[in-house]
Swiss-Prot record:
Gene name, Swiss-Prot/TrEMBL: rpoZ
KW Magnesium (keyword) present: no
Catalytic reactions on record: RNA(n) + a ribonucleoside 5'-triphosphate = RNA(n+1) + diphosphate
Name of protein: DNA-directed RNA polymerase subunit omega
One protein family per Pfam: RNA_pol_Rpb6
Superkingdom as given in the UniProt entry: Bacteria
Amino acid sequence: MLNPPLNQLTSQIKSKYLIATTAAKRAREIDEQPETELLSEYHSFKPVGRALEEIADGKIRPVISSDYYGKE
């Protein structure tokens, strides 16, 4: 079972693809620098789970550049 639930994650970030890429980037950061934790308590022991918890809590947002939407 996914914790946090997918509907809680999609309330913060609408795209499942952006959730996955944002969580992966943040998980790498947590793995390389464990002292960068943003929450006082985590339910997950793994970096990806911790990243998903941060997304669900609204601590992490993806940075979308203007070229993502085809604008220059």
